[in-house]
From Swiss-Prot:
GO terms for cellular component: plasma membrane. SUPFAM superfamilies: P-loop containing nucleoside triphosphate hydrolases. ATP binds at T60, V61, G62, G63, T64, G65, K66, T67. This is Tetraacyldisaccharide 4'-kinase. HAMAP family: LpxK. Pathway: Glycolipid biosynthesis; lipid IV(A) biosynthesis; lipid IV(A) from (3R)-3-hydroxytetradecanoyl-[acyl-carrier-protein] and UDP-N-acetyl-alpha-D-glucosamine: step 6/6. The gene is lpxK. One of its GO terms (molecular function) is ATP binding. InterPro entries: LpxK, P-loop_NTPase. Belongs to the LpxK family. Transfers the gamma-phosphate of ATP to the 4'-position of a tetraacyldisaccharide 1-phosphate intermediate (termed DS-1-P) to form tetraacyldisaccharide 1,4'-bis-phosphate (lipid IVA). It comes from Pseudomonas fluorescens (strain ATCC BAA-477 / NRRL B-23932 / Pf-5).
Amino acid sequence: MALSDRLLNAWYNGHPALKLLRPLECLYRRVVTGKRQRFLAGEGAIYQPPVPLIVVGNITVGGTGKTPLILWLVEHCQRLGLRVGVVSRGYGAKPAQLPWRVSAEDCAAVAGDEPLLIVQRCGVPLMIDPDRGRAVQALLAAEPLDLILSDDGLQHYRLARDLELVLIDAARGLGNRRCLPAGPLREPAERLQSVDAVLYNGAVDDRDDGFAFHLKPSVLVNLRSGERRALEHFAPGQALHAVAGIGNPQRFFNTLETLHWRPVPHAFADHAQYSAQALTFTPSLPLVMTEKDAVKCRAFAADDWWYLAVDAQPSPAFVAWFDTQLMRLLPDRLLP
């Protein structure tokens, strides 16, 4: 088991050795708390975009379903007639220059897997740059936009924001509620009290402190041909190889089991780079992966490789709340 996997297991399931990391946790807390206090005090250079900006992020390490929710937010805003763009750090991306506008024809090595997925799925203008303020400026110089979504960046305080949405895995919660490296938190748990909304991925109902949303499998897509098949393409009990290089691979494997398939799980590191050899398994079975992994595997995919597309399904209460926020932020663009 890789060190990162061991840490995740310890953070969410407990391990006595984590006590040894508490001095480092105290140092980390001081650094991140001081960073936020300087932001609140207006110290340092902070870029204020001329259009509303919404941050969609985490306070935990590991997958929370952020990319599917961003896709939902983009498509929802587009349905309302809003011109929306996205900025992202572009984790793992190696573009020729920064900032870089992602094209649907880019490869994942250039654009990053998540930004490429977002552009290919909904055609939204998207700029990557670790300096998100610079990414926003470049995006606005290229496109007349009403609204910008920041893919992650909750802790990127040099970029002012109008709304903060934080995602939490409902099953794992905040783990041991400790900050890095003794726990999975990027910021102390109290930070949740200052965000605008918390969304719990996998929650059945809304909670007093947040909204529920879940990921709904929608269709199987063949990596080579692009052919779309209903989920019934695989009969109940079908054995298949399951590949997931995401923050929480087990969630993907569990989803396949809820569809009554029998996945042989192959978990990879988040943002893993693949090759045909790395994905050659025995026995020979159909292979199903996440959409995020698929953008990196199309060039060498076999005929029986598929990805499972999933759609975020936020609660009606969140949709109503979000529409109210959009009305507040963009009163001239959205008439009541």
